[in-house]
Amino acid sequence: MTGGKESSGPGTQLAFPGWGAPSREALRWERPGLRLALWPGWLHTTPLHVADLMEHLRRAIPWRQPEVTVYGRRHPVPRLTCWLGDAGCAYRYSGLVECPHPWTEPLSQVRDRLEAHLGVGFNCLLLNRYRDGRDRMGWHADDEPELVADHPIASLSLGASRTLRFRPRPGGAPAEGDPPEPLSVELADGDLLLMAAPTQRYWQHGLPSRLGVKSERFNLTFRAVQPGMEPQPQL
Protein backbone atom coordinates (compact mmCIF):
# COMPACT_ATOMS: atom_id res chain seq x y z
CA MET A 1 0.00 0.00 0.00
CA THR A 2 1.44 3.36 -0.99
CA GLY A 3 0.67 7.03 -0.92
CA GLY A 4 1.52 8.19 2.61
CA LYS A 5 -0.98 6.24 4.67
CA GLU A 6 -1.54 7.10 8.32
CA SER A 7 -2.47 4.33 10.72
CA SER A 8 -4.84 4.96 13.57
CA GLY A 9 -3.19 4.17 16.88
CA PRO A 10 -4.11 1.23 19.09
CA GLY A 11 -7.60 1.66 20.46
CA THR A 12 -8.30 4.71 18.29
CA GLN A 13 -11.73 4.88 16.68
CA LEU A 14 -11.91 6.27 13.18
CA ALA A 15 -14.90 8.64 13.16
CA PHE A 16 -16.32 10.94 10.49
CA PRO A 17 -19.17 13.42 11.00
CA GLY A 18 -22.62 11.98 10.52
CA TRP A 19 -22.03 8.26 10.96
CA GLY A 20 -20.79 5.75 13.52
CA ALA A 21 -17.21 5.06 14.49
CA PRO A 22 -15.94 1.58 13.54
CA SER A 23 -14.34 -0.25 16.45
CA ARG A 24 -11.48 -2.00 14.64
CA GLU A 25 -8.21 -0.34 13.83
CA ALA A 26 -8.00 1.09 10.32
CA LEU A 27 -5.48 2.62 7.99
CA ARG A 28 -6.48 6.05 6.78
CA TRP A 29 -5.60 8.68 4.21
CA GLU A 30 -6.60 12.32 4.64
CA ARG A 31 -5.78 14.91 1.98
CA PRO A 32 -7.57 18.05 0.85
CA GLY A 33 -10.99 16.84 -0.29
CA LEU A 34 -10.18 13.15 0.28
CA ARG A 35 -10.85 10.77 3.16
CA LEU A 36 -10.27 7.04 2.95
CA ALA A 37 -10.18 4.23 5.50
CA LEU A 38 -8.93 0.69 4.90
CA TRP A 39 -9.44 -2.44 6.99
CA PRO A 40 -6.99 -5.04 5.58
CA GLY A 41 -8.49 -8.52 5.41
CA TRP A 42 -11.72 -7.40 7.08
CA LEU A 43 -13.86 -10.10 5.47
CA HIS A 44 -11.60 -12.81 6.91
CA THR A 45 -12.40 -11.56 10.44
CA THR A 46 -16.12 -12.32 9.97
CA PRO A 47 -17.88 -15.70 10.09
CA LEU A 48 -18.48 -15.43 6.34
CA HIS A 49 -16.51 -17.91 4.20
CA VAL A 50 -14.72 -16.10 1.38
CA ALA A 51 -14.38 -19.17 -0.85
CA ASP A 52 -18.11 -19.90 -0.57
CA LEU A 53 -18.95 -16.27 -1.27
CA MET A 54 -16.79 -16.20 -4.40
CA GLU A 55 -18.43 -19.39 -5.66
CA HIS A 56 -21.83 -17.83 -5.01
CA LEU A 57 -20.81 -14.77 -7.04
CA ARG A 58 -19.71 -16.98 -9.93
CA ARG A 59 -22.84 -19.13 -10.02
CA ALA A 60 -25.77 -17.07 -8.74
CA ILE A 61 -25.19 -13.57 -10.14
CA PRO A 62 -26.60 -12.63 -13.60
CA TRP A 63 -23.42 -10.99 -14.87
CA ARG A 64 -23.48 -8.90 -18.02
CA GLN A 65 -21.09 -6.74 -20.02
CA PRO A 66 -22.91 -3.47 -20.79
CA GLU A 67 -21.92 -1.02 -23.49
CA VAL A 68 -21.28 2.69 -23.04
CA THR A 69 -21.20 5.48 -25.61
CA VAL A 70 -17.87 7.29 -26.01
CA TYR A 71 -17.64 10.04 -28.64
CA GLY A 72 -20.69 8.64 -30.37
CA ARG A 73 -19.46 5.04 -30.53
CA ARG A 74 -20.58 2.07 -28.46
CA HIS A 75 -17.95 0.15 -26.51
CA PRO A 76 -18.30 -2.80 -24.11
CA VAL A 77 -17.03 -1.99 -20.63
CA PRO A 78 -13.86 -3.98 -19.82
CA ARG A 79 -15.39 -6.00 -16.96
CA LEU A 80 -18.64 -7.72 -15.98
CA THR A 81 -21.21 -5.98 -13.78
CA CYS A 82 -24.45 -6.49 -11.88
CA TRP A 83 -26.63 -4.11 -9.85
CA LEU A 84 -28.47 -5.32 -6.73
CA GLY A 85 -30.65 -3.30 -4.41
CA ASP A 86 -33.85 -2.64 -2.55
CA ALA A 87 -37.01 -2.08 -4.59
CA GLY A 88 -36.98 1.28 -6.34
CA CYS A 89 -33.20 1.73 -6.09
CA ALA A 90 -32.35 2.09 -9.77
CA TYR A 91 -29.17 3.86 -10.83
CA ARG A 92 -27.90 5.78 -13.84
CA TYR A 93 -24.20 6.02 -14.70
CA SER A 94 -22.16 6.36 -17.90
CA GLY A 95 -25.36 6.54 -19.92
CA LEU A 96 -26.63 3.25 -18.46
CA VAL A 97 -29.77 2.66 -16.41
CA GLU A 98 -29.47 -0.20 -13.94
CA CYS A 99 -32.67 -1.73 -12.55
CA PRO A 100 -31.86 -3.61 -9.34
CA HIS A 101 -31.84 -7.36 -9.02
CA PRO A 102 -33.00 -8.53 -5.58
CA TRP A 103 -30.52 -9.22 -2.82
CA THR A 104 -29.31 -12.79 -2.51
CA GLU A 105 -29.11 -14.26 0.98
CA PRO A 106 -25.27 -14.40 1.11
CA LEU A 107 -24.92 -10.80 -0.09
CA SER A 108 -27.60 -9.67 2.34
CA GLN A 109 -25.52 -11.25 5.10
CA VAL A 110 -22.46 -9.33 3.92
CA ARG A 111 -24.47 -6.10 3.99
CA ASP A 112 -25.65 -6.82 7.55
CA ARG A 113 -22.08 -7.41 8.74
CA LEU A 114 -20.86 -4.30 6.96
CA GLU A 115 -23.57 -2.06 8.38
CA ALA A 116 -22.90 -3.36 11.89
CA HIS A 117 -19.19 -2.68 11.47
CA LEU A 118 -19.52 0.82 10.03
CA GLY A 119 -22.68 2.05 11.70
CA VAL A 120 -24.14 3.27 8.40
CA GLY A 121 -26.78 1.79 6.08
CA PHE A 122 -26.69 0.82 2.40
CA ASN A 123 -29.60 0.04 0.06
CA CYS A 124 -27.79 -1.06 -3.10
CA LEU A 125 -24.71 -2.85 -4.37
CA LEU A 126 -22.72 -2.54 -7.59
CA LEU A 127 -20.82 -5.73 -8.38
CA ASN A 128 -17.80 -5.68 -10.69
CA ARG A 129 -16.07 -8.83 -11.89
CA TYR A 130 -12.54 -8.43 -13.26
CA ARG A 131 -11.89 -11.70 -15.07
CA ASP A 132 -8.13 -11.18 -15.14
CA GLY A 133 -5.62 -8.33 -15.22
CA ARG A 134 -6.84 -7.10 -18.60
CA ASP A 135 -10.18 -6.01 -17.17
CA ARG A 136 -10.12 -2.51 -15.73
CA MET A 137 -12.08 0.62 -14.80
CA GLY A 138 -11.34 4.11 -16.12
CA TRP A 139 -11.11 7.37 -14.20
CA HIS A 140 -14.43 8.47 -12.71
CA ALA A 141 -16.16 9.80 -9.61
CA ASP A 142 -19.30 8.30 -8.08
CA ASP A 143 -21.31 11.52 -8.04
CA GLU A 144 -24.51 10.65 -9.92
CA PRO A 145 -27.65 12.51 -8.77
CA GLU A 146 -29.35 9.27 -7.68
CA LEU A 147 -26.73 8.74 -4.97
CA VAL A 148 -27.44 10.12 -1.51
CA ALA A 149 -25.23 13.20 -1.23
CA ASP A 150 -22.05 12.74 0.83
CA HIS A 151 -22.99 9.20 1.85
CA PRO A 152 -19.90 6.97 2.21
CA ILE A 153 -19.21 4.19 -0.29
CA ALA A 154 -17.85 0.88 1.02
CA SER A 155 -15.74 -1.23 -1.35
CA LEU A 156 -15.04 -4.89 -0.56
CA SER A 157 -12.42 -6.86 -2.54
CA LEU A 158 -12.32 -10.62 -3.13
CA GLY A 159 -9.75 -12.55 -5.11
CA ALA A 160 -6.74 -11.13 -6.92
CA SER A 161 -4.95 -8.04 -5.60
CA ARG A 162 -5.29 -4.90 -7.72
CA THR A 163 -4.30 -1.25 -7.37
CA LEU A 164 -6.95 1.45 -7.00
CA ARG A 165 -5.66 4.87 -8.00
CA PHE A 166 -6.90 8.30 -6.96
CA ARG A 167 -6.22 11.70 -8.53
CA PRO A 168 -7.66 15.21 -8.01
CA ARG A 169 -10.58 15.97 -10.30
CA PRO A 170 -10.03 18.53 -13.06
CA GLY A 171 -10.41 21.91 -11.42
CA GLY A 172 -8.50 20.82 -8.36
CA ALA A 173 -9.22 19.72 -4.83
CA PRO A 174 -10.02 22.42 -2.25
CA ALA A 175 -6.43 23.37 -1.42
CA GLU A 176 -4.17 26.35 -1.90
CA GLY A 177 -0.99 26.01 -3.90
CA ASP A 178 -0.08 22.93 -5.90
CA PRO A 179 -2.73 20.20 -6.24
CA PRO A 180 -2.30 17.08 -4.09
CA GLU A 181 -0.27 14.20 -5.49
CA PRO A 182 -2.10 11.16 -6.88
CA LEU A 183 -2.54 8.22 -4.54
CA SER A 184 -2.39 4.44 -5.05
CA VAL A 185 -3.96 1.90 -2.70
CA GLU A 186 -3.28 -1.82 -3.08
CA LEU A 187 -6.43 -3.84 -2.42
CA ALA A 188 -6.05 -7.50 -1.49
CA ASP A 189 -8.46 -10.36 -0.84
CA GLY A 190 -10.89 -9.49 1.95
CA ASP A 191 -9.91 -5.80 2.20
CA LEU A 192 -12.58 -3.23 3.03
CA LEU A 193 -12.08 0.32 1.73
CA LEU A 194 -14.32 3.19 2.77
CA MET A 195 -14.52 6.37 0.67
CA ALA A 196 -15.98 9.14 2.82
CA ALA A 197 -17.26 12.58 1.86
CA PRO A 198 -16.20 14.79 0.20
CA THR A 199 -13.95 12.40 -1.77
CA GLN A 200 -16.30 11.97 -4.75
CA ARG A 201 -16.65 15.74 -5.17
CA TYR A 202 -12.95 16.45 -5.47
CA TRP A 203 -11.21 13.23 -6.53
CA GLN A 204 -11.50 10.57 -9.24
CA HIS A 205 -10.54 6.92 -8.92
CA GLY A 206 -9.79 4.15 -11.39
CA LEU A 207 -8.48 0.60 -11.60
CA PRO A 208 -5.83 0.19 -14.33
CA SER A 209 -5.05 -3.07 -16.08
CA ARG A 210 -2.34 -5.32 -14.66
CA LEU A 211 -1.39 -7.82 -17.32
CA GLY A 212 0.53 -10.09 -14.97
CA VAL A 213 -2.65 -10.93 -13.05
CA LYS A 214 -4.19 -14.16 -14.37
CA SER A 215 -6.91 -14.71 -11.76
CA GLU A 216 -10.19 -12.91 -11.18
CA ARG A 217 -11.20 -10.24 -8.70
CA PHE A 218 -14.67 -9.38 -7.43
CA ASN A 219 -15.40 -5.89 -6.15
CA LEU A 220 -18.54 -5.21 -4.11
CA THR A 221 -19.32 -1.49 -3.72
CA PHE A 222 -22.12 -0.78 -1.27
CA ARG A 223 -23.93 2.52 -1.79
CA ALA A 224 -27.05 4.49 -0.89
CA VAL A 225 -29.33 5.84 -3.60
CA GLN A 226 -32.49 7.87 -3.30
CA PRO A 227 -35.33 5.40 -4.01
CA GLY A 228 -38.07 6.22 -6.46
CA MET A 229 -36.72 5.95 -10.00
CA GLU A 230 -37.95 2.63 -11.40
CA PRO A 231 -37.16 2.14 -15.10
CA GLN A 232 -38.21 -0.94 -17.05
CA PRO A 233 -36.27 -4.07 -16.03
CA GLN A 234 -33.40 -5.07 -18.30
CA LEU A 235 -33.98 -8.10 -20.49
Task: Locate the predicted segments by residue.
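Non-heme Fe(II) oxygenase metal-center motifs and adjacent flexible, charged/small-residue loops
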Residues: 1-235
